[in-house]
UniProtKB/Swiss-Prot annotation:
This is Large ribosomal subunit protein eL24. Binds 1 zinc ion per subunit. Its cofactor is Zn(2+). Keywords: Metal-binding, Ribonucleoprotein, Ribosomal protein, RNA-binding, rRNA-binding, Zinc, Zinc-finger. One of its GO terms (cellular component) is ribonucleoprotein complex. GO terms for biological process: translation. It comes from the Archaea. PANTHER family: 60S RIBOSOMAL PROTEIN L24 (PTHR10792), RIBOSOMAL PROTEIN L24 (PTHR10792:SF1). Part of the 50S ribosomal subunit. Forms a cluster with proteins L3 and L14. SUPFAM superfamilies: Glucocorticoid receptor-like (DNA-binding domain) (SSF57716). Belongs to the eukaryotic ribosomal protein eL24 family. A zinc finger (C4-type) spans 6-36. SMART domains: TRASH.
Length: 62
């Protein structure tokens, strides 16, 4: 079993946890929580949401 990375916040997902969402074009999204899934479905981008690891990584030096 391998650990996955959340497609929204870049958090780690343990084997057997989280959700897998398959879009109409066949691409697969992995979510660590319903919070990440709902934010993605609302059209938000992880880079612009302050609590995500993606935002923290990009804006580390600023």
């Amino acid at each position: 079993m391998e650990w996955k990375t959340c497609s929204f916040c870049e958090g780690t997902i343990e084997p057997g946890c989280g959700k897998k969402y398959v879009k109409k074009d066949g691409s697969v999204m992995h979510f660590c929580s319903s919070k990440c899934e709902k934010n993605f479905k609302l059209g938000r981008v992880g880079r612009k949401v302050k609590w995500t690891n993606t935002f923290k990584r990009i804006n580390r030096g600023q």
